[in-house]
Amino acid sequence: MPIQRIAITASANAPLTTTPVKIATRNLEFYYGTFQALKQINLEIPEKRVTALIGPSGCGKSTLLRIFNRIYALYPKLEARGEVFLDGENILSPKYSINRLRSKVGMVFQKPVPFPMTIYENVAYGIRHHEVMCKSQMNDRVEQALQQSALWEEVKDKLNQNALGLSGGQQQRLCIARAVALTPSVLLLDEPTSALDPISTSRIEQLIEELKTKYTIVIVTHNMQQAARVSDYTGFMYLGDLIEHDRTETIFSRPSKQQTEDYITGRFG
């Protein structure tokens, strides 16, 4: 039986060579103690596009994603080597402020993690840690973030209710609102729909399409159909190596590496 390829629906029209680069890694390696999780990663992520990272479990996708906002700095014995440039500046440099980085690079995790406080305070929380503004300005920022996350119409009359009362899909969109409230330029999404039902997943995917007009988005997903639907570019990773990175249409229809071909056609992984 011939192997069925995944239909491509994402709009990946711009070649890598003409799209401005937002994030670039140079000879990037990462270590969990003595274990090397990433090996000489050289990757350019285009601005205001969606880049998907695919590959089997344990290949380094989430590790790479978390380097982009240095979340590993919270834990001892974890070390990144090499360079990661955001808008031309090396974010791995000790001179690059963590607070500055976190305001420019937002992150949404696999499981929705709303704070045990009101919907309003969930969105306002991060803003208060980075900026000082009056009540009316804060109200505007909270509304803007909820509008961008396609949640405003559902919660505008219950902003003072506990966020834990929202559905799973609403909670994940709230987490996206919390991330965009800081007006970052990059959004990192680590399997943002894996814990959601199909309807909520569809809402998040539609939202990603809307958000990429303002943000550079990097998404980790185990769902190759999702990668094909939402991304403009795709990187395939295996055992800590970046095997191939190209336009999504190219990756799924005519990959240049046999390992990529084998993975997307289900021969391994």
UniProtKB/Swiss-Prot annotation:
* Gene3D superfamilies, sorted: P-loop containing nucleotide triphosphate hydrolases
- Ranges for domain ABC transporter: 23-264
| Record InterPro entries | AAA+_ATPase (IPR003593), ABC_transporter-like_ATP-bd (IPR003439), ABC_transporter-like_CS (IPR017871), P-loop_NTPase (IPR027417), PstB-like (IPR005670)
Catalyses which reaction(s): phosphate(out) + ATP + H2O = ADP + 2 phosphate(in) + H(+)
Q: Which GO terms describe its molecular function?
A: ATP binding; ATP hydrolysis activity; ATPase-coupled phosphate ion transmembrane transporter activity
Its keywords, alphabetically, are: ATP-binding, Cell inner membrane, Cell membrane, Membrane, Nucleotide-binding, Phosphate transport, Translocase, Transport
User: SUPFAM superfamilies in the record, alphabetically?
Assistant: P-loop containing nucleoside triphosphate hydrolases
Can you state the subunit structure given in the record?
The complex is composed of two ATP-binding proteins (PstB), two transmembrane proteins (PstC and PstA) and a solute-binding protein (PstS).
What protein name does the entry list?
Phosphate import ATP-binding protein PstB
Record organism: Xylella fastidiosa (strain Temecula1 / ATCC 700964)
